[in-house]
């Protein structure tokens, strides 16, 4: 291998990706985007394609995969170790892992093996690196099985594994050489042998070669099993000398090779194809034997290639016709593919390539399975994951690129069969090239482990398969499907334990090629919550929408996109990272490498409870140029503290480099404010300002600080704060003492805690109804360095100073509050979606003295969510665990009434049977116990949740004709003799947020006339796995499918009207199906129209009605009226039937016609129609 110039890799303290980023343009929390460490390498080597944080006894490192290192020829790929936390910057070092990554006893092809494209750390120390395009040669075929290596903590390859298989393209080749004196020069024959043998993979389980030389006698130069490698055979072949002799006994040489060289004693293998290559330069002296010798070779299936060297004839100017015909007769059929001739010995090397290709073609025929690949092209190691017990290796190329997951544990390797991951629907329409194993992961649940694999090309929309390992067998539990064709749903999987209880809380599934509204590859991440052994959809995450502009002519474009495709590919990398913001919950980082015209960006989402917050906490853009540095966010890892500050750091890779971002500590700052006096009493002035008496107030503001990561240590913080008086008013009613300003700004250094005092005075204003709000805003003096403020806590504090109570001349205010409540619904709430609203109207009235700080407190059941308020007259509501609404603040006067509405929405995570609300009205004023009974109201309203499903029905036939002249068969031997088949299909598809309940589907159809004649005959039904239909006695009740013969009587004629009135008189059969909860349920019923009944019946046309009725088995989960029933009408008509009109109809019609004629004649007579005016004129 030609030595290659090592890539120039330098570590710089400032991340070169972020030089062009302005801090203000990105949402920032506690990942430091200014002071980072970067590692750069050639973009053409894909340096940065994978990254992992790593620690061993030598120190802390960033491991970086570079799958195409070795440009421009070998491109084996490799892994670099990049030191961090050292006093001085040190370069990254290539580990040269492919050199020691090897599988014994195979001919390896490491070029383009993309080693380092998969890189995962081992929880027990060391790491795993894979080259999914590693191949080995089997004959002339290259099998891309992929390979993975366990690397020790000291960066040494411990062992390598790949699903290599024994080559089944084996050949036993015996070369029969003419060594007579006429062969000249002999060196040309040896050169021919060398060129031919170099092209063969020689070994005990591959091709074996033996050489026989003949002239007057036959010599075995070496046997088939003599040498076990190509190199050994070449050495032996170079030592072969010419035997000599005056005669050429070709038939003897061939027959000896057949009888002796192809025996097991000389290394021939049973069942292996036999090949003989005969090289000669003249006619044989025993050609009379050739015909029988060749027939014996044919009988033993020996393929023969014959080579005629014409040098002796050309040098003697002799005719070659007879010689060529003899050598052609030796070759196997077809002769044109098995016979060669060369002008002389020197020209032998010119046919080596063609001869080799034709011999190699026999290898392919020896392995008939080569047409359909199993693990030969598996690309094992395309993805990898360490679970508790198993190492999971994705093998996307297995089974004709359907893919599989190789499970390895210690020395055990489980390679699932092609059908192992096929679900029942998939067997009917087997997916091709679904790439199962594109990514793999696992989830830990109490007492078990779930294994997860993605197949992004399944059914073109993608799928995720969840399964368990039970005694080495795979048991599929669930599949999750994508929603958009080509989105690559399932190409990225990550599981995460948010609350650190050792059990998985979420599964995140990436669909990085999800198309946005403008056909840009926006990308999408689906979040699923773990519920026992199943995953339930929770939410979707999307990036900032990218504007795709190929030309600046578009007015909305501000920057032209130079790179295609446009978009973000959000979800290309999804990493579960340890608690970044030190809030006790683990976090998620998602890469969007195509953002900003292929520069790339990442998004950080903080964990909360058992899920993540839907809004991202921080977006880190690359700032790269999209060429020398691009696809920032291609790889992410954040598991370790690499600089010793106790905080998790994040490593982000792209093509051309990687960056290590340090996390900043989180400062917890809490502020309290107290006032003396704590109420404003205008009647009691306590100071003079500018010669006027007024009310002065002393404010004490205390700051308490600590670091989240070091709560027990003393922390000193430099803060800047600003105090604003009467902050709710545009014009303030108070100023700070000694100034005429409502605002002051100061700096303070706080060591654990510190209190300061400020005084202010009230202005002579007449508006003293609303309290005075004092607002204190604070921030760190240097927000770009050191810790950051906790974003879970406010950096603004508000306190209200109320005015003194107005109770007239009384010292005590005795209020009497009443609370009246009404709701929009009283008897039953039907909830159709989480956006449905439920209003509660509250009326608070004070029948006593002024009630100060009047408020209503609302407690509600967890199936309700506070949405907002309407029509409130004063102030507003706050919602924490309870809803507290200030009513008439600061006081509710005597006789005053306030009415407002509280609006609720429904929490789809808690489906309770009742909506329960407890409301109370209270104040800071006194109220007698006997008047408190009207201060509280309890509401309990039953709730039902309308499941958003879709209920479809269809039939294969809607009209069937019965010929009038059709005859009734004497016997019914099979269902084909009964009549037309009608297939009825029912589909129930889940929609909406509510879970699917257990359902009951009742399918009714007319099966017998009133006289007991069959109408529709059920021959069977089928359904999805979650459906169970009964009774089975309805299925083929006459047993016709079982071979029972049925005799039909032709003499009977149905009473008139029996069929015509079938809708009301026919007997009805009902199939009842129980449906377990599923996103999709299907039931198909096959019915036969019993034609003998309709042939003997009198009718022209009628409808048969089939009814499907759906019912929920859960009293809380109901169905909408539009999704409960479905009816299908099948029209039956009789063709060519003459109409038979009743006699009374004929007589009545004749009488009516005569009566009408008489009336017409009478009318004409009355108007003189029958008089002749001309006759009267003549008479006159």
Curated annotation (Swiss-Prot):
Disulfide bond sites: 82-92, 687-696, 702-755, 807-813, 877-885, 1029-1062, 1066-1073
Positions bound to Ca(2+) 1: 497, 499, 501, 505
GO terms of biological process kind: cell adhesion; cell adhesion mediated by integrin; cell chemotaxis; cell-cell adhesion; cell-matrix adhesion; cellular extravasation; integrin-mediated signaling pathway; negative regulation of cell population proliferation
Entry superkingdom: Eukaryota
GFFKR motif, short sequence motif: residues: 1168-1172
Glycosylation sites: 100, 105, 112, 217, 317, 341, 402, 418, 459, 531, 698, 747, 779, 820, 839, 882, 907, 938, 965, 973, 1007, 1084, 1103, 1114
Signal peptide range: 1-28
Cytoplasmic side, ranges: 1166-1180
Membrane-crossing segments per the record: 1143-1165
A GO CC annotation given for this chain: external side of plasma membrane
Membrane topology designation: Single-pass type I membrane protein
Extracellular side: 29-1142
Gene3D superfamilies per the UniProt record, alphabetical: Bicelle-embedded integrin alpha(iib) transmembrane segment, Integrin alpha, N-terminal, Integrin domains. Chain A, domain 2, ntegrin, alpha v. Chain A, domain 3, ntegrin, alpha v. Chain A, domain 4, von Willebrand factor, type A domain
Binding site for Ca(2+) 2: 579, 581, 583, 587
Residue stretches making up the VWFA domain: 175-364
Keyword Transcription: no
Family: Belongs to the integrin alpha chain family.
Assembly, per entry: Heterodimer of an alpha and a beta subunit. Alpha-1 associates with beta-1. Interacts with RAB21. Interacts (via cytoplasmic domain) with PTPN2; activates PTPN2 phosphatase activity towards EGFR and negatively regulates EGF signaling.
PANTHER family from the UniProt entry: INTEGRIN ALPHA, INTEGRIN ALPHA-1
Role: Integrin alpha-1/beta-1 is a receptor for laminin and collagen. It recognizes the proline-hydroxylated sequence G-F-P-G-E-R in collagen. Involved in anchorage-dependent, negative regulation of EGF-stimulated cell growth.
Name of the protein: Integrin alpha-1
Protein species of origin: Rattus norvegicus
Encoding gene per record: Itga1
